[in-house]
């Protein structure tokens, strides 16, 4: 759903994509925080994936943020370590596809979190399309 207008995203908008080699550094990964709930063997990583300016321009987007909560049973990886592993898996999946768009990023994150140590993944997004 477009966060600004409240309209649903169409299939054409969600599947709109660009070749990955046309856009340098298409995604920006940021770890917001790492939570260790008390009395559990769980670690929660809050990761934000943003489309960079060139990718937003190519896809006619004003803003595109994807916020993920990744619940894991892996207690060894620190925030930056998990982020680099997550980024490597997402980018390798997108490189194999050869294209990048909204749905492709979501599928790449699903690929990156399809591991035995990941128990839950919650997704929230902020997407604004250019309407002018």
From Swiss-Prot:
- Binding partners and assembly: Homooligomer. Interacts with the replication-associated protein (REP). Interacts with host proliferating cell nuclear antigen (PCNA). Interacts with host retinoblastoma-related protein 1 (RBR1), and may thereby deregulate the host cell cycle. Oligomerization and interaction with PCNA are necessary for optimal replication enhancement.
What does the protein in this record do? Answer: Increases viral DNA accumulation. Enhances infectivity and symptom expression.
Organism of origin: Cabbage leaf curl virus (isolate Jamaica) (CaLCuV)
Extract the Pfam families matched here. Gemini_AL3
Q: Which residues cross the membrane?
A: none
Q: Which UniProt keywords apply?
A: Host-virus interaction
Q: Which InterPro entries does this one have?
A: Gemini_AL3
| Family to which this protein belongs | Belongs to the geminiviridae replication enhancer protein family.
Q: What is this protein called?
A: Replication enhancer protein
Keyword Transmembrane helix listed: no
Q: Does the keyword Iron-sulfur apply?
A: no
Q: Which processes are annotated in GO (biological process)?
A: viral process
């Amino acid at each position: 759903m477009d966060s600004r207008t409240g309209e649903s995203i169409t299939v054409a908008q969600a599947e709109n994509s660009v070749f990955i080699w046309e856009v340098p550094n298409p995604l920006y990964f940021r770890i917001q925080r790492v939570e260790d709930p008390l009395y559990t063997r769980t670690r929660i990583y809050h990761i934000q994936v943003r489309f960079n300016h060139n990718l937003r321009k190519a896809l006619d987007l004003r803003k595109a943020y994807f916020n993920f909560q990744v619940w894991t049973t892996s207690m060894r990886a620190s925030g930056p370590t998990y982020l680099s592993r997550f980024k490597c898996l997402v980018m390798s999946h997108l490189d194999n596809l050869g294209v990048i768009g909204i749905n492709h990023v979501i599928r790449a994150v699903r690929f990156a979190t399809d591991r035995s140590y990941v128990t839950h993944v919650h997704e929230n997004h902020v997407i604004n399309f250019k309407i002018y």
